[in-house]
């Protein structure tokens, strides 16, 4: 793994920390039934039927995914090359799901949650980082 690839994985780990903090906060608020302070219409989004899957908060599922990405990105940074594939196998679906959830906010709920958008931005950033790392690896061949 080149120095650039390690830096990309380190940045991915940092982005995963941001996503984990965000989704962890939303999960705790959801489970406690607390109000989320937000400048946008978070209550409409977080109170919608799309906020949980089978009683499990979507943010909680995201938090678990961010823990997986964080762990794999750290392992990749430490030289475990196969961990890069784990990062990619989580980051790409996370970005796709996030795009779907943005669609739900825009066209079904007609409200946006800044915290949810932050998580989506983190997921999309992770996917871009993974694709960048992949392109660097291909170019090195």
What are these regions (language model features)?
Residues 1-141:
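Membrane-interfacial helix-loop segments of redox and metal-homeostasis proteins
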């Amino acid at each position: 793994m080149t120095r650039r690839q390690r830096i990309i994985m380190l940045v991915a780990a940092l982005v995963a920390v941001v996503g984990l903090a965000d989704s962890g906060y939303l999960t705790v608020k959801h489970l406690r039934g607390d109000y989320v302070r937000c400048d946008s219409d978070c209550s409409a989004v977080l109170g919608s039927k799309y906020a949980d899957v089978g009683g499990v908060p979507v943010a909680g599922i995201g938090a678990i995914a961010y823990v997986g990405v964080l762990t794999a990105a750290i392992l990749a940074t430490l030289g475990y090359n196969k961990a890069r594939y784990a990062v990619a196998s989580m980051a790409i679906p996370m970005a796709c799901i996030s795009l779907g959830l943005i669609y739900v906010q825009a066209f079904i709920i007609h409200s946006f949650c800044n915290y949810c958008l932050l998580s989506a931005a983190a997921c999309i950033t992770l996917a871009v980082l993974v694709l960048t790392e992949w392109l660097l690896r291909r170019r090195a061949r």
